[in-house]
Amino acid sequence: MRNFTIETADGRLLAWANSNWTNLVISKGIPARLTPADTDNYVLSEKMEMDYAPRKISLPDGMISQEPFQVQKHHLDTNHHVNNCQYICMAEDFLPEKFKVYQMRAEYKMQAKLGDMICPKAKVESGKVVVSLDDEKGKPYAIVELAEK
């Protein structure tokens, strides 16, 4: 688990986050054992006080299939798969007009690569939009939840 904040120069809190990470052996797709070289640059501190959402995002009933699209070069990161931020941008395409995002949650499931098809499903509920960005078999690459205050 990793907590972090973004603050102004005078210490006013602008944003805060909690994220869960797994260090992987990329060639095998399995968790890697951490070494001192992986951890020495990080300082452990107390868990921040905040509302901690569940790790998994629940898909609501009645998700509506949207127009599929193909992964393009501009979606890719240096590892040649879709950059995590791009999944958020894709999900934002399904926000209603004047929706003001207060909270974003993302669950990254598998890597999409150049040429893969993204088959989105979305559901707008009161104060919240949930988007599942799936492969052609309906398996999610990422699930994104955007909520208003």
Identify the residue ranges that each predicted region occupies.
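Generic structural detector for well-ordered beta-strands
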Residues: 20-22, 68-75, 107, 147
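HotDog/MaoC-like acyl-thioester-processing domains
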Residues: 1-55, 112-114, 123-149
